[in-house]
């Protein structure tokens, strides 16, 4: 039997697992962020950014004390400074464990989420729950100029930061985006589709080079959060902007979508869902 090479290899990903019919916080599977940050050359004490991972849960339900199902959707906000991320399949199974469990109130459910997720990731987690009758329209578009119409020839489908370069020393402030981001799950290899924003101030980044670089994630195996941190780190290293924000909005899988944000100067991020979400 092959020995697992990382914490992720020991998770429930890729395994046949039964759905738990009763609330069970032990399902949650934390994965140390540092395992991948070692590759990028920083740790919690030397983070080159601040940020958060905003998970949207669409399959939210539990029973009230009379056994009547309650439904809604929720946002879960994890700090990039948390030592652990939560493996997505375990998160899905954890949320599903509420489906057959009776709770006294909505507040009791939210308190469980906050307590369990905070313990698992190692830092307080923010939770916003929305009833379906109070939900607002959140669909929007990515800010900035979309690179996807550029007529480029692509040859690299494994991450290649050497593609990145600037055009000149002229300092610009611009926001660029692309819907062509695709990476694969670190463990199962299943495709993760997303859209990404790069906002920066510094020497102008060559647009064709940036698009080729983003497309080069197409056969790369890494979790959503890790991909965004890699994009941030590579751009800082190869283009050296003074200010940089990178965030991605990924399509949902298993009733959850993951939206990582990283920046060295911004604290507030747009959370509008995209049409594919």
From Swiss-Prot:
GO cellular component, as recorded: cytoplasm
Residues at the catalytic site: 185 (thioimide intermediate), 192 (proton donor)
Subcellular location: Cytoplasm
UniProt-annotated binding residues for NADPH: 88-89, 253-254
Residues annotated to bind substrate: 86-88, 224-225
InterPro entries: GTP-CH-I_C/QueF, NADPH_dep_7-cyano-7-deazaG_red, QueF, QueF_N, QueF_type2
Domain of life: Bacteria
Entry's EC annotation: 1.7.1.13
Any one Gene Ontology molecular-function term assigned to this protein's record: preQ1 synthase activity
Reaction catalyzed: 7-aminomethyl-7-carbaguanine + 2 NADP(+) = 7-cyano-7-deazaguanine + 2 NADPH + 3 H(+)
GO biological process: queuosine biosynthetic process; tRNA modification
UniProtKB keywords: Cytoplasm, NADP, Oxidoreductase, Queuosine biosynthesis
Recorded metabolic or biological pathway in which this protein acts: tRNA modification; tRNA-queuosine biosynthesis
Location, primary (coarse class): cytoplasm
NCBIfam families (alphabetical): QueF
Entry similarity comment: Belongs to the GTP cyclohydrolase I family. QueF type 2 subfamily.
Function: Catalyzes the NADPH-dependent reduction of 7-cyano-7-deazaguanine (preQ0) to 7-aminomethyl-7-deazaguanine (preQ1).
PANTHER family: NADPH-DEPENDENT 7-CYANO-7-DEAZAGUANINE REDUCTASE
Assembly behavior: Homodimer.
This protein's name: NADPH-dependent 7-cyano-7-deazaguanine reductase
Name of the gene: queF
């Amino acid at each position: 039997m092959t020995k697992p090479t990382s914490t992720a290899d020991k998770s429930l990903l890729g395994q046949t697992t039964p759905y738990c019919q009763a609330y069970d916080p032990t399902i949650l599977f934390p994965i140390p962020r540092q395992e991948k940050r070692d590759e990028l050359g920083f740790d919690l004490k030397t983070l080159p950014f601040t940020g958060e991972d905003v998970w949207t849960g669409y399959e939210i339900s539990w029973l009230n004390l009379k056994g009547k199902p309650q439904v809604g959707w929720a946002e879960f906000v994890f700090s990039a400074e948390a030592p652990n991320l939560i493996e997505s399949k375990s998160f899905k199974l954890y949320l599903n464990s509420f489906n057959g469990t009776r709770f006294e109130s909505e507040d009791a459910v939210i308190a469980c989420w906050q307590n369990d997720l905070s313990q698992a990731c190692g830092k307080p987690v923010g939770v916003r729950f929305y009833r379906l009758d109070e939900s607002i329209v959140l669909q929007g578009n990515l800010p900035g100029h979309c690179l996807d119409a550029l007529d480029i020839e692509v040859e690299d489908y494994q991450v290649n930061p050497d593609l990145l370069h600037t055009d000149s020393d002229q300092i610009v402030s611009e926001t660029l985006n692309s819907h062509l981001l695709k990476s694969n799950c670190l463990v199962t290899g299943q495709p993760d589709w997303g859209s990404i924003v790069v906002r920066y101030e510094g020497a102008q980044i060559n647009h064709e080079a940036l698009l080729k670089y983003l497309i080069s994630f197409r056969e790369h195996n890494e979790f959503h959060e890790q991909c965004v941190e890699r994009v941030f780190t590579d751009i800082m290293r190869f283009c050296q902007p003074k200010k940089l924000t990178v965030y991605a909005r990924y399509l949902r899988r298993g009733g959850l979508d993951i939206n990582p944000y990283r920046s060295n100067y911004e604290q507030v991020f747009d959370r509008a869902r995209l049409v594919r979400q």
